[in-house]
Swiss-Prot record:
It comes from Yarrowia lipolytica (strain CLIB 122 / E 150). PANTHER family: AUTOPHAGY-RELATED PROTEIN 17. Keywords: Autophagy, Cytoplasm, Membrane. This is Autophagy-related protein 17. It comes from the Eukaryota. One of its GO terms (biological process) is pexophagy. Pfam families: ATG17_like. GO terms for cellular component: Atg1/ULK1 kinase complex; phagophore assembly site; phagophore assembly site membrane. Its main location: cytoplasm. The keyword Membrane applies. The keyword Membrane applies.
Length: 408
């Protein structure tokens, strides 16, 4: 009986640590699972936030690139407006130069261009400094557009790289085990641990029986009947033969517990890697945000410079258009002046013809009047005293139409 007691004692001593180890492994597995769950929640939250931030960053550079290209198109159109205004001025001045002066003028000018105040329009005609203004405006875009494109490409590459790593992590998680599989592993490990506890209880009962048998054999306690010790010995000897198998089964169950809990640990480790990836993404996004701030500042400067450039061009175009309108009006007025000169010449010629005609009629009327007076004197003069009227013998007066100081 002493031998059976020692064997039971040794078996119980060997089983205790195995069961305790099982409980310790399970406790760590439960903690690991809890950590994995929290990491999963954080990872999912960060993943959604990062996906949104990557999308915003991509849209930012896409919009910045589109907006800058539109600004470049606007600047290009303004250069076209500038050239058109300058061309219109050159054309207007060319028409003045090609229009000869057909009237006598005091300054001896040969064409209408000579009436232009060259000092007043020299800035519009020569366009001094405008090449530099145009080039400065274009240089902004030559620097900014490639910079925006480069940063946008960096964002897209970084986004794709993180997406690739996330896909690999996700694929690895899927291949390892699913979320439901993790709980299955833990449940299986807990079931094995319960089996180990049951086996440990069996060993404890066997030990208690061996202890009673030893007490019975030494007379420490009295048997309930005369056959108790013999029957108990037979049972204990039979159970003692199964002790190695029980210990082996405990070890097998412990191995199964460890295996299942290792899966939980692996899952937690992988979730930690996924979470770490999202944290690294955050660092990448923060770097992108700094770049976005710098890009935004450059874009705002470009918009401000472009606005100033557009105002300069608009001012030049407005001033030049006013000059063109003035000289076009001058040309049209000169053409109207030529028609006015023709009209006046025709009117003067007509008035001169009328004066000639009137003078001829006046001369004829004067002759006729003189003849009529002479006929009167011839018929009635002999009967009238000579001093009766001083003008009796006077001839008819002569009248004449003539130009006086440019007026009739």
């Amino acid at each position: 009986m002493e031998q059976l007691f020692r064997e039971a004692q040794d078996a119980l001593a060997a089983a205790g640590p195995l069961c305790q180890e099982s409980q310790d492994v399970l406790a760590r597995a439960r903690q690991n699972l809890e950590v994995a769950v929290h990491l999963g929640i954080r990872t999912q939250f960060l993943a959604k936030a990062h996906a949104h931030q990557w999308t915003l960053a991509s849209k930012f550079y896409s919009n910045a690139l589109t907006r800058t290209k539109k600004s470049l198109e606007t600047v290009t159109r303004q250069q076209t407006r500038f050239q058109a205004a300058r061309g219109a001025l050159e054309e207007a001045l060319g028409e003045l130069a090609a229009t000869p002066v057909q009237l006598r003028v005091n300054n001896g000018a040969h064409n209408l261009r000579e009436f232009v105040d060259e000092d007043l329009i020299s800035a519009q005609v020569q366009g001094k400094g405008w090449n530099e203004v145009h080039e400065e405006a274009l240089n902004v875009f030559r620097v900014l557009l490639p910079e925006i494109q480069r940063h946008g490409d960096i964002v897209n590459r970084s986004k794709k790289e993180f997406e690739r790593e996330k896909a690999e992590q996700t694929e690895l998680l899927i291949h390892q085990t699913s979320d439901s599989g993790i709980y299955d592993l833990l449940n299986s490990a807990e079931a094995c641990s319960e089996d180990m506890a049951n086996l440990l209880q069996s060993l404890a009962r066997h030990y208690d029986l061996c202890e009673r048998g030893q007490d019975l054999s030494t007379g420490a306690i009295e048997a309930e009947d005369v056959n108790e010790l013999g029957e108990l010995r037979a049972v204990l000897e039979n159970d003692a033969q199964q002790l190695p198998d029980v210990l082996d089964e405990l070890q097998e169950r412990l191995d199964e517990v460890k295996q299942g809990c290792q899966g939980v640990h692996n899952h937690m480790t992988q979730m930690y890697h996924s979470y770490s990836l999202e944290v690294r993404q955050l660092e990448g996004i923060q770097a992108v945000e700094k770049t976005m701030d710098a890009t935004l500042e450059i874009c705002e400067t470009q918009q401000r410079d472009t606005k100033e450039y557009l105002l300069k061009v608009q001012r030049y175009v407005s001033e030049t258009s006013a000059v063109v309108t003035h000289y076009q009006t001058f040309l049209n007025s000169y053409k109207a002046l030529l028609h006015e000169a023709e009209r006046r010449n025709a009117a003067e010629a007509k008035m001169k013809d009328y004066v000639t005609e009137v003078n001829a009629k006046l001369a004829q009327m004067s002759i006729q009047e003189t003849n009529r007076r002479q006929d009167f004197v011839a018929q009635q003069g002999d009967y009238l005293p000579a001093d009766i009227w001083d003008e009796l013998l006077l001839p008819s007066r002569r009248f004449e139409a003539r130009e006086l100081d440019g007026e009739l």
